[in-house]
């Protein structure tokens, strides 16, 4: 099911390509423009090399890089939609593919920090999904918490797509939210360094298994003179097994066939381990329809705005000061 890295379109389902884009070293706006040109060139080259591909995915930070000294500066921020996303839209339309792109988005409210945003563009050149990272990688990332929820859109081959960004994938509730809204192919774009390589692979698999959906994940690759980024694009089956696993090579293109209908059928026909259903219908053998209240305290507390850990008052790090971010004034807390 795609482990050989197919080049053609399957009879059912679709072919996906995840690009292990080299970590960009960005010091000026010209560098961003160069990255955009490189991404577009890579998109067209991938379509030429894999003519059956219908979805091409680029990792987090591939457009604007990770220059932490400048990533909040106006020079480095983009708008969605904007002239840069129009270039991506034009490329998708020309290549007749769906594309997933990463944008550090200027906040419409200038008093607030920027968003870390992902977009999906369809083969007609339209932005069909816009997602703002719900769980920035605290305490290192300064992005404002996303406010668009977890949107789901139609994709190729009967797929229903959702996108999470990097650390989002460590939050199992977010994958469940996507599946609860119908997602059967969960995309994860990341800019992780090697410290969490194993955990990244683990959660890609668990997010698939817990929700009976495919996961397609890709990370930046290479060295930026500070950290090494592991690449290792991964496609997981809805049973949590890894179908395709990339290596650590920058520019590696990880491809695989995805059959969304198989995930849909599992959700409809499985009894054992249909856990996304069982969560809301526990014990349905003994009680018709099961119990609909899972009785989970943390869910009730989250809904009531009262979420608090037993050890929270004693935690050492609860703001960005360890990485030099302000805790008062400016954009903080706006």
UniProtKB/Swiss-Prot annotation:
GO biological process: any one?
A: putrescine biosynthetic process from arginine
Q: Which reaction does it catalyse?
A: formamide + H2O = formate + NH4(+)
Q: Which Pfam families match?
A: CN_hydrolase
Gene3D superfamilies (alphabetical)? Carbon-nitrogen hydrolase
| Keyword entries, A-Z | Hydrolase
Q: Does the keyword Hydrolase apply?
A: yes
- The domain of life is Bacteria
EC code(s) of this entry:
3.5.1.49
The record's function comment reads: Is an aliphatic amidase with a restricted substrate specificity, as it only hydrolyzes formamide.
Q: Which HAMAP family match?
A: Formamidase
| Protein name in the entry | Formamidase
């Amino acid at each position: 099911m795609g482990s050989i890295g197919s080049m053609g379109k399957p009879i059912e389902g679709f072919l996906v390509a995840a690009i292990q884009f080299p970590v960009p070293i960005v010091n000026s706006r010209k560098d961003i423009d160069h990255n955009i040109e490189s991404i577009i060139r890579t998109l067209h080259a991938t379509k030429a090399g894999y003519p059956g591909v219908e979805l091409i995915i680029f990792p987090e930070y591939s457009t604007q890089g990770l220059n932490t000294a400048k990533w909040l500066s106006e020079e480095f921020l983009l708008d969605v939609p904007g002239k840069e996303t129009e270039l991506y839209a034009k490329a998708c339309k020309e290549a007749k593919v769906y594309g997933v792109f990463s944008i550090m988005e200027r906040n419409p409210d200038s008093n607030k920090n920027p968003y870390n945003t992902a977009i999906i563009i369809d083969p007609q050149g339209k932005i069909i999904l816009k997602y703002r990272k719900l769980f920035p990688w605290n305490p290192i990332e300064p992005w404002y918490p996303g406010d668009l929820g977890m949107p789901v859109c139609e994709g190729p081959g009967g797929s229903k797509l959702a996108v999470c960004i990097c650390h989002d994938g460590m939050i199992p509730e977010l994958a469940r939210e996507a599946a609860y809204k119908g997602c059967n192919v969960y995309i994860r774009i990341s800019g992780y360094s090697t410290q969490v390589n194993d955990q990244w692979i683990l959660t890609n698999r668990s997010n698939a298994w817990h929700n009976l959906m495919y996961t397609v994940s890709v990370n930046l690759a290479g060295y930026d003179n500070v950290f090494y980024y592991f690449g290792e694009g991964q496609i997981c089956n809805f049973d949590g097994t890894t179908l395709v696993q990339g290596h650590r090579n920058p520019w590696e293109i990880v491809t695989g066939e995805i059959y969304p209908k198989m995930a849909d059928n599992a959700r409809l026909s499985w009894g054992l381990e249909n856990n996304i259903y069982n969560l809301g219908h526990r014990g349905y053998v003994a009680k018709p329809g099961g119990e609909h209240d899972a009785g989970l305290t943390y869910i009730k507390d989250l809904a009531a705005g009262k979420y608090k850990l037993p050890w929270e008052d004693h935690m050492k790090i609860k703001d960005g000061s360890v990485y030099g971010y302000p805790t008062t004034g400016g954009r903080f807390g706006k």
